[in-house]
Amino acid sequence: MTQDELKKAVGWAALQYVQPGTIVGVGTGSTAAHFIDALGTMKGQIEGAVSSSDASTEKLKGLGIHVFDLNEVDSLGIYVDGADEINGHMQMIKGGGAALTREKIIASVAEKFICIADASKQVDILGKFPLPVEVIPMARSAVARQLVKLGGRPEYRQNVVTDNGNVILDVYGMEILDPIALENAINAIPGVVTVGLFANRGADVALIGTPDGVKTIVK
């Protein structure tokens, strides 16, 4: 199976967690896009979705799924999204698609976070994938200096502006042995909107696409 076929398999597998009559939290990226395609088959059964990016919103609306503003919603049963890396503690690096802040906000509201990923995203230690940090533009250099002090090698992601109007620093060279401590430390830097470490709020369920089928891991 190709990597895209593995992503499609987990995207469709996540449908089993969608309850009729509910509002579904939806992530961003190539794997989440397969889940949106699958969700389109249930559009008459669900109330709608809350989306983590303009791109996902457009795709959902194109399938006839009503998209709610998060401010209209008290709670979400599930949030379904991919990951750039996921470790054995269900902690993740996310933000390769630059939607990390909205993803983290929606994940915090959801009762259950379902991570969908192909097996290549599983790691023992987070950090080989560069760690994205969303930063207010005027603070870019100041934040970069602080990230160097934390042992990272930040690089400005050229020609990318987030849906919130901010910029992304990708931090290379991090071996993240204590993800919660690092998430808290980076989030405390003035000018940081959020970091793409999902450690304080990790996944509750991981659906991992393998050549032998979809593997389910429950926290």
From Swiss-Prot:
Organism this protein belongs to: Salmonella typhimurium (strain LT2 / SGSC1412 / ATCC 700720)
EC class of the enzyme, as a word: isomerase
InterPro entries for the chain: NagB/RpiA_transferase-like, Ribose5P_isomerase_typA_subgr, Ribose5P_isomerase_type_A
Alphabetical UniProt keywords: Isomerase
UniProt-listed Pfam families: Rib_5-P_isom_A
Pathway stated in the Swiss-Prot or TrEMBL entry: Carbohydrate degradation; pentose phosphate pathway; D-ribose 5-phosphate from D-ribulose 5-phosphate (non-oxidative stage): step 1/1
Gene: rpiA
Name listed for the protein in its UniProt record: Ribose-5-phosphate isomerase A
Keyword Signal found: no
